[in-house]
Amino acid sequence: MKRPKLRKSSKRLSCHKRYKIQKKVREHKRKVKKEAKKSGPRKHKKDITVPNAAPFKAQILQEAQLRRQQQEELKQKQKLDRQKEVAKKRKLEEKKNNNSEKKEKRDKKRKETKTPDDPDVVLCRQVNKVLEQSDVIVEVLDARDPLGSRCSQAEEVVLKSPNKRLLLLLNKSDLVPREMVEKWLQVLSAELPTVPFRCVAQIQDKSEKKKKKKVPVSADLVTDPKCPGGQVLLKILHSLCPSHNEAIKVGVIGFANVGKSSVINSLKQSHVCNVGPSKGTTKFLQEVRLDPQIRLLDSPALLVSPHNPPVALMLRSASESKVDVLAAVEAILKHCSKQELMLHYTIADYRNSLECLTLLAHRRGMLKKGGVPDTEGAGRLLFNDWMGARMKYYCRPPDSPVCQPHISREVVAAMSSGICSEELAMDNASTLKALKCPNSANIVVFASVGPTSAIMDETQLVDPEPELIEEELEENDGEEEEDMEEEEDDDEGSEEEEDLEAKSLTQEVTSAKEKDSKSAGPAVSFDQAADDDTYDFNTDFV
């Protein structure tokens, strides 16, 4: 049976589509021609071949291959030379830039002497100003670490002037067990008059103070049970006044976070000095009139010398910005009892500071994304607890009383003149009875590192080694020049090796030529002039 004819699709198009296709084709051809014109006419390189009938064909091809290899090697060598030149230029430019940067740094270090605008210089000058203007100096000590918060340099400055008196105030006595405070009072009172003290926790601001009857501040302080030790301190200061008509200036000094401004606020019974949980709140000298006979001078914190142990640097630093919290926690953990710290925070045993902070972060729920413990936050928490009142710790006094080298018997007699030691001991005993001291079983024992040295002269803050800095920079420049010379020697050595390789290659080729010529017979010169065109049977016929 004949199959039905299948109907093929028609090739007819609409005019719109056909003209569109033709237009696209024309545009494509035009574009191709344009690009061909840009590149220029292609020149096909003719392959220069050696006919088979030519004698010494193998030798000629070998020579051609050798020339090609030499040209390629020459190109590679030129390329390497260009790269080396570019690298040298780049190194020279970098060296110039580095030299200019080093000069700028050198100039900055030369100019970076401590100017009067520097905060450390300002603090040092303010402290010295307080020491000069004061008749009586009250050094505030932290009862948790009295030896570590004591500054022998400041005491020496005070004791050099014969008319000044020096007292010790054992602040934060309510954070230490009573027996420890009694022992520290015995140790410190053997050198200078010492008074235990506790600041008032909450003081009403002057702007929010209600109208009251005018009562002398000293009389109000005597009857105030919230400030133990204030009555004893005022009694001593009044006994040191030369007369009722003359007033004395009392300078309050000490390291950061010992409570200097809080002591003045507690004595004044009003918020006259700025206080805060952060270190270094007081920046300038402030005079407060306590009563007609006593004027208190609030001073900034003493500047810690960088030659102190790490624990003293962390705990006594005048600003929190200079304190590395993790390093501070590591230094603190090395000097405190592990068992008591574990009981305080209810954490397991740990091997190092990082493991302790990890356990503390898990205990307090301080976790980041993915359950990663926030060790920085835990370190900040532990450091703030240590600096504040949450973490209760104390230092044991020395077994045998060690007198400071700058305090002699004459100094002890001069400082205690006009002050009855028996009355002071009785007053201190009554003050200790009024304090609510914690039990020693729940407190961490801390190993003190001794007195903390401070910077009292602003010239010690100036950078004293500009010449050493210049010598170091010159040494670095000399080392860079030596490196450049070594690189140049290496480049010359590599070039010599390449020349030797090329010479050896040419020698091998010439030896191969000689062997071929000996085996093939006398060489034929194709470049010979066409003078001997006549045929000679004797010479031409072989």
Swiss-Prot record:
Residues 65-104 have a biased composition (Basic and acidic residues). Residues 56-114, 467-515 form a coiled coil. GO terms for molecular function: GTP binding. GO terms for biological process: regulation of cell population proliferation. Its main location: nucleus. GO terms for cellular component: nucleolus; nucleus. GTP binds at residues 171-174, 254-261, 298-301. It is found in: Nucleus; Nucleus, Nucleolus. In contrast to other GTP-binding proteins, this family is characterized by a circular permutation of the GTPase motifs described by a G4-G1-G3 pattern. May play a role in regulating cellular proliferation. This is Guanine nucleotide-binding protein-like 3. It comes from Xenopus laevis (African clawed frog).
